[in-house]
Amino acid sequence: MADKPIKEEKPRSVDPTVLELMPECTEQAIGTAWDRLKKQSPQCGFGQKGVCCRICAMGPCRLDPVKEKLKYGVCGVDCDTVAARNFVRMIAAGAAAHSDHGRGVAETFLATAKGEAPGYEIKDEQKLLQVALDLGIEIGDRSVQDLAIEVGEKCLGMFGEQTGPIPFLKRAPLKRQAIWKEHNMEPRGVDREVVEIMHRTHMGVDQDPVNLMQQGSRCALADGWGGSMIATELQDIIFGTPQPILGRCNLGVLKKDEVNIIVHGHEPTLSEMINVVAQDPEMIKKAKEKGAKGINLGGMCCSANEILMRHGVPNVGNFLQQELALATGAVDVMTVDVQCIMDALPKIAACYHTKFISTNYRAKMSGAIHIQFEEHDAVNIAKQIVQAAIDNFPNRGNVHIPDISCDLIAGFSHETINYLLGGMFRASYKPLNDNIINGRIRGIAGVVGCNNPKTTHDSDHLALVKELIANDVIVLQTGCSAIACAKEGLMLPEAAAKHAGKGLAEVCETVGIPPVLHMGACVDNSRILMAATAVVKQGGLGDDISDLPAAGAAPEWMSEKAISIGQYFVASGVYTVFGTTFPTMGAPGFTDLLFNKYEKIVGGKWDFEPDVSVMARKMIEHIDNKRAALGIDKAKERVLYDMAMRRELDG
């Protein structure tokens, strides 16, 4: 039996499906993340503030810069070095998670190119050519297969490269590349940067917070411009580059009269194949023989975002809804791969009829059925999982599915935005730049990240995004933050008229887009990097990402991946603010480095703001300051261009 719930006064969520299912959890004596957090409270203040050191067996040491007896650890280390070590170790873990995802995709990609992965194929040949060019590969009249093999080998090579720099850095603006080179931040190989952090943070090695952060930046950049970018680009080539697509989201997408399968995790190699198999007429026939009307596939967390933006597969919910999905009693199989999968899930599944299936050797779980996924036998493994769900359908007990879901438009890849703005034959970011310059759009914000039970579920995402779009800031989203806003209806074109400021609403209506754009899963933050780079290269808004009227935020973060993402945005020149908690607040010197001094080095900086209204104000103020620096802070007279004037502009 799972943990028993306890009374909670603070609102757990603003999502009505969550609130509706809480009594179900209480009745079944199923504790959730909220219950377990309450039992853990009060949490260790030293750990929360980043000043607990467990690196050697002379400790653990708890440091406090104010109390004389706690100023130094046993080895003499101070709080700033401890916080820096802990922080860059979080970067290493986050970068390793995203980059190992990228490695797995590269391996599947290469197997596909060699014809060794039945069921997978090269779907976007145009993007294959573009990636090959960016990797410095000669195209000539080579076959698609030959080109794909070299792309796969070159991407896999980025992980073990020893000298660097990694090739995708050349995609960044030239000024940004020069900054990285000047400060010795160019990643060599993805794996090398993670290993070097672990060496530097061993007892008695790197004891300089500035030097530690130099390596932290290099490792984070190896994630954003390396491992994550590899994952995004190669997934687009073999699964298809996302285009605008209609979908539905929230727990109400589960169906009482159909076999329900949830794919949860991050790597789309498995979920793509389950999506294919779930539509197989033979499998649907088998489901009907068991009394179901069909097979309903849904996604959770970033697996949801992956298959939503390519196929319109319903999105069941974000991070803090994974336990509640099982509490509906309607899930016949939940299959998981890696990352953000709560340890409690097998215990909760055991309270119902649900079969909980793990599929990745990196992520086995006690109480789970393990079916190892292999790309060379993907179809048969997917059939095995779908068959398990079909066979389990008759075993259901009571079912309680909240009748709440919402439409959304997903699929806004960097390429799609390009075409939407400029047209199929003249794809360009110029209309976006023009509308930023003329003030209709105030700026750009990336709002991304997780959920955290320390704050009311989804509330900070929604409050921040609504405030930003009301002030004419267009919002780009990934991950669980994207799901939060999708459930609120903010990813529909009509949301612009309801929530956006006059200028942004006008642009959204003209182009036919929502004011909040779904750009994918957490690895797809690399799409936001590419979009920012495209804006710079289009011209008129400076010559570096740090010049843009843009900001980033993760208001409800909880994962080490979020720290790596935040650092690669900061190191790329973006002001980045996190909410809820921040893991360096017990080290004033190191925090000052991140929040202030670091901007002089890389043009971007960190910030922490638990009050989401203040967070929005800080982001808008930063955007306004960047507009002023560009000289576009004052509205300009509108000019109606005749054809001759337009030709002159085009020339």
Name these PLM-found stretches.
Residues 2-651:
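Anaerobic metallocofactor- and corrinoid-dependent redox/one-carbon enzyme cores
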